[in-house]
From Swiss-Prot:
Gene Ontology molecular function, alphabetical: DNA binding; zinc ion binding
A single GO BP: DNA recombination
NCBIfam families: recR (TIGR00615)
Pfam family, one: RecR_C
InterPro entries: DNA_Rcmb_RecR, Rcmb_RecR, Rcmb_RecR_Znf, TOPRIM_dom, TOPRIM_RecR
Coiled coil (UniProt feature): none
Protein name: Recombination protein RecR
Residues annotated as domain Toprim: 80-175
Similarity section: Belongs to the RecR family.
SMART domains reported for this sequence: TOPRIM (SM00493)
Keywords: DNA damage, DNA recombination, DNA repair, Metal-binding, Zinc, Zinc-finger
Species in which this protein is naturally found: Burkholderia ambifaria (strain MC40-6)
CDD domains reported for this sequence: TOPRIM_recR
């Protein structure tokens, strides 16, 4: 038996989400149609609203409903610090620490030549213009500690240092509450190398 075309279209639409394969998409579609049609309608309205109202901040490239986001509009922030992150989710995580009071630039990705993602796709030119505005003194590279994130940080760091900017990288190490017995050797090694005086 062939499933209705409307259901097939829903399954295919759900597959655009990261980590959602054909089986998961089919389960989600059937759940929404069988048990939560109201939720399905709310999901559809929310997706439509988001695509119509969200845009990229003109300064930092994060998602916003205005031309300039809330963080970039905040006069209390330190404009001499610019933290570079891969995604808006990374920015939110840093904000939740309440330890950073500078500004941001969101790359919306990371360098991955095998996937066709180069400097243009991560808005490299915009970042360089922003960092070279004469106000920024330090660029904090907060890309993830994956191979692509490290390559991105290296590429950005070399280019920004050549422009006379101070470039720093987030430290790596043992997580808060972590026990050495359960931490991988690479993390422990990095924590040992990045140790500081007390």
């Amino acid at each position: 038996m062939k499933q209705p075309s409307a259901l097939s279209a829903l399954v295919e639409a759900l597959r655009v989400l990261p980590g959602v394969g054909p089986k998961s998409a089919q389960r989600m579609a059937y759940h929404l149609m069988q048990h939560d049609r109201e939720g399905a309608e709310r999901l559809g309205r929310s997706l439509l609203f988001a695509t119509e109202h969200l845009q990229h901040c003109e300064k930092c490239n994060t998602f916003t409903e205005a031309q300039i986001c809330e963080v970039c509009s905040d006069d209390e922030r330190d404009p001499t610090l610019l933290c570079v992150v891969e995604t808006p989710a990374d920015q939110i995580m840093l904000e939740q620490t309440m330890t950073y009071r500078g500004l941001y630039f969101v790359l919306m990705g990371r360098l991955s030549p095998l996937d066709g993602i180069g400097p243009k796709e991560i808005h490299f030119d915009r970042l360089v213009r922003r960092a070279s505005d004469g106000v920024v003194k330090e660029v904090v590279l907060a890309t993830n500690f994956t191979n692509e994130g490290e390559a991105t940080a290296h590429y950005l760091g070399q280019t920004l240092k050549a422009r006379g900017l101070a470039v720093t990288r987030l430290a790596r190490g043992v997580p808060v509450g972590g026990e050495l017995e359960y931490v991988d050797a690479g993390t422990i090694a990095r924590a040992m190398l990045d140790r500081r005086t007390m």
